[in-house]
């Protein structure tokens, strides 16, 4: 238990590495809960803010220098991965080569603006949607729509 945790943390510290402790039992219990509210209460009861799996994913993205951006349509919201520092043109190519070939611009709402306004429509109404060109550097959590013409 705690002896092994301490040894792993000490070793990782010497190697300048991050340690993320994950309990398979706790992760399993979290996944068995039905609602986000139940999960939140369970996590609070055991002194955690988020599941270990979420920490692992975030840490892996950081280690690999990756960001996530989102596209949203009437039927589907999808997360896409792009390298940190990549631009809108590169992001368009992640979705489809035609998006990249015929790239005109991208409509972008930042993650924080989206959360603050509660929806894409309300973000647009608040003037938080902007048009960006090929060289726009994609930020983590951006909600993007690509305009293209082939």
Predicted feature residues:
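Nucleotide-binding motor/catalytic cores of P-loop/tubulin-like NTPases across gene-expression machines
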Residues: 24-33, 76-145
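Short, surface-exposed secondary-structure boundary micro-motifs
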Residues: 148-149
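Electropositive, glycine-dotted interaction segments
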Residues: 6-9
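Short, small-residue-biased leader/transition segments that mark boundaries at the very start
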Residues: 1-4
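Anionic-ligand-binding alpha/beta catalytic cores of soluble enzymes and soluble regulatory domains
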Residues: 24-76
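Conserved beta-strand/loop subsegment of P-loop NTPase cores
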Residues: 15-22
